[in-house]
Regions:
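Long, compositionally biased, glycine/small-hydrophobic-enriched stretches that function as flexible linkers
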Residues: 2-216, 220, 240, 247-250, ...
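Anaerobic metallocofactor- and corrinoid-dependent redox/one-carbon enzyme cores
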Residues: 2-20, 27-31, 35, 181-531
Length: 531
């Protein structure tokens, strides 16, 4: 490929084919090349781990960090990416020291050139891309569990196995089972993260979260990392500083060990793709703990901080010591708003309710089962996934708005910002709109579906349940593979289908799982209710 770069891992990729000069996400060619070099080094490390008995927790931790750093909207800093690649190569040299001085290198532990992948036969490229991008998504979940002290050797070893396979000359018949295996391992990884979050922060319970911003100094925290939020809440306690969540951090309010802090006040803003407008005049610092960071505009760049694997050139970074003093001092310096700010969601709502994870929902299992049997609840819709800037995403707003009053809408991840401030009322004494949580809380949605299937003594595909999903980045890929691993059929996916799905691979998914693209809300609702 004769391009400055090549990347087609996210939903917004240029022309639905691939970014070749600059990423739609905002990364430049230099950053894309650094990500490819890091990925190539990770594949080299996986090759070394395959031959060395000394591979262990330190090896897997580097793989997890490296994969997470290449996720969309995480790391835009070539220097940071190159430094991480250097650490990866140093670990490889530790595992196979003789390879560094070999006079006749065999290439079995060498770095992989990603140009080989991007230029491969389209079906091979498609399956390897599913494997690589799904691994990046799963690594994000493994990272969040890891920082809480929870690890799973099966998950970590599989990531190495997947990276190794990307660098091999394998056939479709060899790659396809590994792609589907990733879905099963990711289910195990999401279960690990669910265990980590609930044991560290308590089981989520439903809570109303206001969009109002009170006067005085405050900090906005974006991303997914609950551990970082907890540390910030501890360090700001008693300082007269309020903390507001943003984006995927919203479900943090439902965890008892987080909501016990009275200065965790509410949620600021709408979905991640609106941040450049919403942060423009913000009199407060913003801390990014994970994706989705967009290139900050000059109007607010002096107020943005990063931590963990997130990085952007010239932005201050909070290191592993997690001393948030610079963020706190900036909040006090900026001072916040002088008067209360009454903000709304995209549909005019002044707040939202979150916290309907599997424990909270299944506590009402008997009531739900009876409501289905009596006909009070006709159908469940899982409308969730990533949000993004593509115009067609208003489909999800209209789909939810048009769901009949005898149906329940389950939602999760940042796609909910399209409709989570709507008042859909109640059905059978339950809210019609149930926000399960972050994208990794797809695990909760799966547990709810499995419990209902057990109650009705049927398979998940036989339930009055339809999945209408939106995707943007690589965590959506591993979740989709998990649903396929479970044999779930008739998923509606949008707003566009992944550019990395070749016609043959897409046809396989259609034939075996009946995956279909979204069309228009009215037609899809009629079809799904008819089924």
């Amino acid at each position: 490929m004769d391009h400055n770069m090549f990347c087609f891992q996210c939903e917004q990729t240029a022309g639905c084919t691939g970014c070749t000069s600059r990423g739609v996400c905002g990364k430049d060619a230099q950053t894309a090349q650094a990500q490819d070099r890091l990925t190539g080094a990770l594949i080299g490390l996986a090759r070394a781990a395959d031959t060395s008995p000394d591979a262990g927790p330190e090896t897997w931790q580097l793989m997890i960090e490296g994969l997470f750093a290449t996720l969309t909207n995480v790391n835009f800093d070539p220097d940071s990416l190159n430094a991480l690649a250097g650490r990866v190569r140093a670990e490889k040299q530790r595992l196979v020291p003789d390879c560094a001085v070999c006079t006749a290198p065999c290439g079995r532990t060498g770095d992989y050139d990603l140009a080989q992948l991007w230029g491969a036969q389209e079906d091979i490229r498609s399956l390897k891309s599913l494997l690589l991008f799904g691994s990046r998504g799963m690594a994000a979940y493994a990272y969040h569990a890891m920082v809480l002290g929870y690890r799973d050797e099966t998950v970590e070893c599989f990531l190495s196995k997947a990276l190794f396979a990307v660098g091999e000359d394998w056939s479709m018949e060899e790659l396809l089972p590994l792609v589907l295996e990733l879905g099963g391992v990711n289910l195990q990884c999401m279960a690990l993260l669910d265990k980590a979050n609930t044991e560290c922060f308590g089981k989520p319970t439903p809570v109303h979260v206001p969009f109002t911003v009170e006067p005085g100094p405050f900090i906005v925290v974006s991303g997914h990392d609950l551990h970082d939020l907890k540390l910030l809440l501890e360090q700001t306690a008693g300082r007269g500083i309020a903390v507001y969540t943003h984006g995927e951090m919203l479900p943090a309010h439902a965890y008892p060990e987080l909501k016990k802090y009275p200065h965790l006040k509410g949620n600021f803003g709408t979905a991640w793709q609106n941040q450049q407008k919403e942060f423009a005049d913000l009199p407060a610092p913003i801390l990014f703990t994970t994706n989705c960071l967009m290139p900050p505009r000059p109007s607010y760049a002096d107020r943005v901080f990063t931590t963990a694997v997130v990085a952007y050139p010239d932005l201050p970074h909070i290191g592993a010591e997690k001393d948030f003093t610079p963020v706190i001092e900036r909040a006090l310096e900026l001072g916040g708003y002088a008067e209360t700010q009454h903000r709304t969601g995209l549909n005019g709502g002044t707040g939202t309710t979150t916290g309907f994870a599997h424990d909270a929902v299944l506590a009402n299992a008997a009531q739900i089962v009876e409501a289905v049997r009596s006909g009070a609840i006709r159908h469940f819709f899982l409308v969730g996934g990533c949000d993004g800037a593509r115009a067609g995403r208003n489909y999800y707003t209209e789909f939810v708005r048009q769901t009949p009053p005898d149906t329940v809408v389950l939602t999760l991840a940042c796609g909910k910002y399209r409709f989570h401030d709507m008042d859909l009322g109640t059905v059978a004494g339950l809210p019609r709109l149930l926000d399960i949580g972050q994208c990794n809380d797809a695990y909760s949605a799966i547990q709810i579906a499995l419990a209902l299937a057990e109650a009705f003594q049927c398979g998940v595909n036989d339930l009055p349940l339809s999945m209408v999903l939106s995707w943007y980045e690589q965590k959506a890929v591993c979740i989709l593979l998990t649903l396929l691993h479970l044999g779930i059929r008739n998923i509606r996916l949008g707003p566009t289908l992944p550019a990395f799905l070749s016609p043959n691979v897409l046809q396989y998914l259609v034939e075996h799982y009946a995956i279909a693209p979204i069309t228009i809300p009215e037609a899809d609702l009629a079809a799904l209710l008819g089924s």
